[in-house]
């Protein structure tokens, strides 16, 4: 016989409890029975197996979000009125969040970036305290790279003078000049030759080599430690300095340039007025003068510099300074310059007092000793005998050659061997 289920056993217990209690309200009894049946049904379900329970419903999967666009794409999609949300309102200018300066950058697409293995690189144009100065630096660099047709911050008419100047130098040199005008120019190695940096005070020293007969000449207030420089100033750099020092020209030369431009203008007007309307138009010959007019002389930068008053005064001061230094050195060393009789050679003799002895020295030819020869040979101290010195000093008319030196040495050996005291020594 099968054992009763858990629901039947629970019902029997409830009936027994109700009988013991002496009955009760029928409604309450019915509600209790319904609850117990529900509990029994749940117990049977658990006992029958948990695999019959339905899983809880899942949340609906949300749709994937769209790809977030980059900062450059957002800025490019902004209208002109919303451009103030960027760090700067100008093109090619960004504000550094740490230093607060405005940096100008340029993207050069014509080069290949080997570090990142892609086309194009960012060109740094310097950091500026003023936002407008950084924007103008970007405009100048963009005009140098892409010409007057590119998009810039300010009108092209503001850079009419700069467009003429930037055509005379290379792109690399022009970018260096822009960086040097920035507010945060780094004191690193110099870009140009002739500007060595001093290690003790971090200053630049403009030097010229082989100028006016001097091996080294400093144009700055401080002299370098080792007296060397990076190279000759401006000789190996292909930069036209004529436009930089044109204001050093005399007034007459400036007036001639102005008159030349006026002559060209008058010539154009005369040609245009003489032409008839029926004739086909021809371009006038600009700047071509007739044979009667003298041709203008083209002056280079060196010519302008050599003709200027500043260069002449500079050369005079340097010559005077070198003479004073030479005279002071001679006075310190105890030298006196004395003239020498004319012997057919342009020489100067210098008498130097060394331990009471008179030694005569000449830079090119050595005159003969005119002292009276005396036979006062002393083997202990031969320097008092003039014959001892005649073996070393040649006559003024005899050129110095290798054969002469060999002959003089041989004569000295003969004198030494003929000495009666030579064998005793």
UniProtKB/Swiss-Prot annotation:
GO terms for biological process: auxin-activated signaling pathway; brassinosteroid mediated signaling pathway. Signal peptide: none annotated. The modification Phosphothreonine is found at residues 338, 343, 347. The keyword ATP-binding does not apply. It is found in: Nucleus; Cytoplasm. It comes from the Eukaryota. Disruption phenotype: Reduced size of various organs due to decreased cell size, increased cell number, and abnormal cell arrangement and microtubule orientation. Brassinosteroid (BR) loss-of-function phenotype with semidwarf plants, reduced length of internodes, erect leaves, up-regulation of BR biosynthetic genes and decreased sensitivity to BR. Residues 89-155 bind DNA. Its main location: nucleus. This is AP2-like ethylene-responsive transcription factor SMOS1. The keyword Nucleus applies. Pfam families: AP2. Disulfide bonds: none annotated. GO terms for cellular component: cytoplasm; nucleus. Transcription activator involved in the control of organ size. Acts as an auxin-dependent regulator for cell expansion during organ size control. Binds to the promoter of PHI-1, a gene that regulates cell expansion, and positively regulates its expression. Cooperatively functions in a transactivating complex with DLT to enhance the transcription of the SMOS1 target PHI-1, and to regulate plant organ size. Interaction between SMOS1 and DLT is a crosstalk point for auxin and brassinosteroid (BR) signaling. Acts as a positive regulator of BR signaling. Keywords: Activator, Auxin signaling pathway, Brassinosteroid signaling pathway, Cytoplasm, DNA-binding, Nucleus, Phosphoprotein, Transcription, Transcription regulation. Phosphorylated by GSK2. Phosphorylation of SMOS1 leads to its degradation by an unknown mechanism. Expressed in the apical region of leaf blades, young leaf sheaths, a broad area below the shoot apical mersistem (SAM) and near the tip of primordial leaves. In developing roots, expressed at the tip of seminal roots and lateral root tips. Expressed in developing nodes and basal region of internodes. In flowers, expressed in lemma, palea and anthers. GO terms for molecular function: DNA binding; DNA-binding transcription factor activity. Induction: Induced by auxin. Induced by brassinosteroid (at protein level), but repressed by brassinosteroid at mRNA level probably via a negative regulatory feedback loop. It comes from Oryza sativa subsp. japonica (Rice). Belongs to the AP2/ERF transcription factor family. AP2 subfamily. The gene is SMOS1. SUPFAM superfamilies: DNA-binding domain. InterPro entries: AP2/ERF_dom, AP2/ERF_dom_sf, DNA-bd_dom_sf. Interacts (via C-terminus) with DLT. Interacts with NSP2 and SHR1. Interacts with BZR1 and GSK2. Residues 43-65 are annotated as: Disordered.
């Amino acid at each position: 016989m099968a054992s009763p289920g858990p629901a039947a056993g629970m019902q029997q217990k409830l009936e027994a409890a109700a009988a013991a209690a002496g009955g009760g309200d029928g409604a309450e009894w019915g509600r209790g029975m319904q609850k117990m049946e529900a509990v029994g049904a749940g117990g049977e379900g658990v006992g029958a197996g948990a695999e019959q329970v339905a899983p809880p419903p899942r949340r609906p999967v949300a749709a994937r979000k769209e790809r977030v666009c980059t900062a450059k794409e957002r800025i490019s999609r902004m209208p002109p009125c919303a451009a103030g949300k960027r760090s700067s309102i100008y093109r090619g200018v960004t504000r550094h969040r740490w230093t607060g300066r405005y940096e100008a950058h340029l993207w050069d697409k014509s080069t290949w970036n080997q570090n990142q293995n892609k086309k194009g690189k960012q060109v740094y144009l310097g950091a500026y305290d003023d936002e407008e100065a950084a924007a103008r630096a970007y405009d100048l660099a963009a005009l140098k790279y892409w010409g007057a047709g590119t998009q810039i911050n300010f009108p092209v008419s503001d850079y009419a003078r700069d467009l003429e100047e930037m055509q005379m130098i290379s792109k690399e040199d022009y970018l260096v000049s822009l960086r040097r005008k920035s507010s945060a120019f780094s004191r690193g190695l110099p870009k140009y030759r002739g500007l060595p940096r001093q290690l003790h005070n971090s200053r630049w020293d403009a030097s010229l080599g082989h100028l006016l007969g001097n091996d080294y000449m400093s144009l700055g207030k401080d002299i370098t430690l080792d007296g060397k420089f990076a190279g000759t100033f401006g000789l190996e750099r292909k930069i036209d300095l004529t436009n930089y020092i044109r204001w050093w020209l005399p007034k007459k030369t400036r007036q001639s340039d102005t008159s030349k431009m006026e002559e060209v203008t008058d010539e154009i007007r005369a040609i245009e007025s003489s032409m008839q309307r029926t004739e086909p138009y021809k371009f006038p010959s600009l700047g071509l003068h007739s044979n009667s007019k003298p041709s203008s002389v083209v002056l280079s930068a060196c010519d302008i510099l050599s003709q200027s008053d500043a260069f002449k005064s500079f050369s005079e001061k340097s010559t005077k300074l070198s003479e004073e230094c030479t005279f002071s050195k001679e006075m310190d060393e105890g030298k006196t310059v004395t003239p020498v009789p004319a012997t057919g050679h342009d020489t100067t003799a210098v008498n130097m007092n060394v331990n009471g002895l008179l030694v005569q020295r000449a830079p090119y030819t050595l005159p003969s000793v005119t002292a009276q020869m005396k036979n006062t040979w002393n083997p202990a101290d031969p320097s008092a005998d003039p014959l001892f010195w005649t073996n070393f000093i040649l006559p003024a008319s005899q050129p110095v050659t290798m054969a002469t030196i060999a002959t003089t040495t041989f004569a000295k050996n003969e004198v030494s061997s003929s000495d009666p005291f030579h064998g005793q020594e």
